[in-house]
Amino acid sequence: MTSKLINFITIEKERFEDECVKFIKNVITDSINSRNIATIGLSGGSTPKPIYEMLGNDSSIDWTKVYFFAVDERYIDKSSKDSIYDLISKSVFKNRENLLVDHFITPNTSLPLKECIETYSNDLKKLIEKSNGSPDLVTLGMGEDGHIASIFPNSPKSPLDETDLVYHTTTERFAIFDRITTNINFLASSKNKVFFMSGSSKKKVWDEMESSQINVSRWPAHKIISSGNTNVFYRE
């Protein structure tokens, strides 16, 4: 797979969070200036946590015009420390709890699974309609097995064949079996995509993915990269 489709940036540890926040903030500013709204999809993980915390401390952003949504979520109580809701509510929204309900669109995992998915899909569609049909940015990571969001490699059905905006996935590799994810085509439609990555083990997996023939079932990131406007911020 060609690397020309990726803007790969290696950043020293001391500047990593600053540069990542600067990138997100630029997308937010440009989106608000052009359409008076910014829509940002967020993934979980240990690498983006300090990025989100730093972003949440930025008082120069007009937060009333920024809407976030969960790229995926674990089907667990939202108060669990393992939920993306918990991560985002305690970082991006730590200083603006009054905006949390209306400005962070996330699955209501207290509902039965089918209803949870349907409700989240409808809420997400309404949000994206405000953003000309696609998000302004999605933040992503890639696991050492090659998964992105909760789209896991070599699933029985190719991610390219998933037509539902939001759907249920499962994994036996990680502790929480049931997941809810947005689909790969929706993520690829985002005006900007950014992967946050740290550590040599993740870089090794990334290099393997990038050097492989295009196979979205094995490497869901191939679909993201081939859609263009993909950035990778890597901390050694």
From Swiss-Prot:
Reaction(s) catalysed by this chain's protein: 6-phospho-D-glucono-1,5-lactone + H2O = 6-phospho-D-gluconate + H(+)
Provide the GO biological process annotations: carbohydrate metabolic process; pentose-phosphate shunt, oxidative branch
State the pathway, as annotated in the record. Answer: Carbohydrate degradation; pentose phosphate pathway; D-ribulose 5-phosphate from D-glucose 6-phosphate (oxidative stage): step 2/3
Enzyme Commission number, as recorded: 3.1.1.31
Stored SUPFAM superfamilies: NagB/RpiA/CoA transferase-like (SSF100950)
Molecular function (GO) terms listed? 6-phosphogluconolactonase activity
What does the UniProt keyword field contain?
Hydrolase
Q: Which Pfam families match?
A: Glucosamine_iso
Q: What class of enzyme is it?
A: hydrolase
Disulfide bridges in this chain: none
**From what superkingdom does this record's organism come?**
Eukaryota
Do the record's keywords include Coiled coil? no
Can you list the GO cellular component terms from the UniProt entry? cytosol
User: Which PANTHER family does the record match to this protein?
Assistant: 6-PHOSPHOGLUCONOLACTONASE
Entry's NCBIfam families?
A: pgl
| Reported function | Hydrolysis of 6-phosphogluconolactone to 6-phosphogluconate.
What is stated as this protein's family in its record? Belongs to the glucosamine/galactosamine-6-phosphate isomerase family. 6-phosphogluconolactonase subfamily.
Protein name in UniProt? Probable 6-phosphogluconolactonase
Protein encoded by which gene: pgl
